[in-house]
């Protein structure tokens, strides 16, 4: 079977690569309520959760290389190709040869993937990974998609994280939940520095290429990738200073520098808000009966030593996954 991880998605290749072509007809994709069929056993999956920037991707690679794992992306912004710096996608080198699924597979101008579509696509990936004798590892920060994938009874018309909604603890997979948690003050400081590093690593140039004058209308934002943090925040900047008007930053006047700084600060603030929402949603899942193991990664932040991460996060994760995999074995 072709490894989708290595498939480069471009508009000219959509008929070949778009994962939506692997979906069943729409009537079977979005039922009123989807219920898991009775099985004699449940497939085992590891689910890595956490706020943006907490280290989910790092832990997923660490575990996949130790337990013959394959990673299924559950970050809805990273489903799309393009804007790899802005969406903070792991490079091929950083993936350490671990197969990834639903990562950069949709063309950037594709419509937003629904939770029902993700449930179908990710379920298929899990079945294929299990059939190869490997361990499916779900990793990403979109908790509404994780919920849609895992719950036994799924109603696409109900938003699970509204205050009026109760979340079921009935799951259609046997799950090992790992929550990589970092204290809010430490995480926010790290996220601010990460935004600065992303801007220095080509995010601004990437966004300038994205803001082609042909896409200056607001309708294009209905597409999935256009909701990425970094794009709407730079709307005002690029409306005032179109990307074709190239000029070195050292030559900018104060007004242009101010518009740029304002956009970067807005990115930081919206990233903080996203992190808070993600933590709140994980806590709701945990309080609803999901057996989520919290891992405190705070000591490893701000430190350059790999040993601290291994001692505080990785070693405990390995123990938890080992117990999970041997459970129920004779």
From Swiss-Prot:
One of the record's GO molecular function terms: ATP/ADP dimethylallyltransferase activity
Transit peptide: 1-35
Top EC class of this enzyme: transferase
One annotated GO biological process: cytokinin biosynthetic process
Intracellular or extracellular location(s): Plastid, Chloroplast
Record bears the keyword Nucleotide-binding: yes
UniProt KW keywords: ATP-binding, Chloroplast, Cytokinin biosynthesis, Nucleotide-binding, Plastid, Transferase, Transit peptide
Role noted for this protein: Involved in cytokinin biosynthesis. Catalyzes the transfer of an isopentenyl group from dimethylallyl diphosphate (DMAPP) to ATP and ADP.
Family according to the record: Belongs to the IPP transferase family.
Protein name as catalogued: Adenylate isopentenyltransferase 8, chloroplastic
Origin species: Arabidopsis thaliana
Top-level taxonomy: Eukaryota, Viridiplantae, Streptophyta, Embryophyta, Tracheophyta
Encoding gene (name): IPT8
């Amino acid at each position: 079977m072709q490894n989708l991880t290595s498939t480069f998605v471009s508009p000219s290749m959509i008929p070949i690569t778009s994962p939506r072509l692997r979906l069943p007809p729409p009537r079977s994709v979005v039922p009123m309520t989807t219920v898991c069929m009775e099985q004699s056993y449940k497939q085992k999956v590891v689910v890595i959760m956490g706020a943006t920037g907490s280290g989910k991707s790092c832990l997923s690679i660490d575990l996949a290389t130790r337990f013959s794992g394959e990673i299924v992306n559950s970050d809805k912004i990273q489903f799309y190709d393009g804007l790899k710096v802005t969406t903070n996608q792991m490079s091929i080198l950083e993936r350490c040869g671990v197969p990834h699924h639903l990562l950069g597979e949709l063309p950037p101008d594709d419509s937003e993937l629904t939770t029902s579509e993700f449930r179908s696509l990710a379920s298929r990936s899990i079945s294929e990974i299990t059939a190869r004798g490997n361990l499916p590892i779900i990793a990403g920060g979109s908790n509404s998609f994780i919920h849609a994938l895992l719950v036994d009874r799924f109603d696409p018309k109900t938003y699970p994280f509204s205050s009026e909604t109760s979340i079921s603890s009935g799951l259609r997979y046997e799950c090992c939940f790992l929550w990589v948690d970092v204290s809010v003050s430490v995480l926010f400081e790290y996220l601010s520095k990460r935004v600065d590093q992303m801007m220095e690593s080509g995010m601004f140039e990437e966004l300038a290429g994205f803001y082609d004058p042909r896409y200056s209308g607001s309708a294009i934002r209905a597409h999935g990738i256009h909701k990425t943090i970094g794009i709407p925040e730079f709307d005002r900047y690029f409306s005032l200073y179109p990307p074709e008007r190239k000029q070195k930053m050292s030559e900018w006047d104060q007004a242009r520098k101010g518009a740029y700084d304002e956009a970067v600060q807005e990115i930081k603030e919206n990233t903080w808000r996203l992190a808070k929402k993600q933590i709140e949603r994980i806590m709701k899942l945990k309080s609803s009966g999901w057996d989520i193991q919290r891992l405190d990664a705070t000591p490893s932040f701000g430190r350059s030593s790999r040993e601290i991460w291994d001692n505080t996060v990785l070693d405990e994760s390995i123990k938890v996954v080992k117990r999970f995999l041997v459970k129920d074995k004779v």
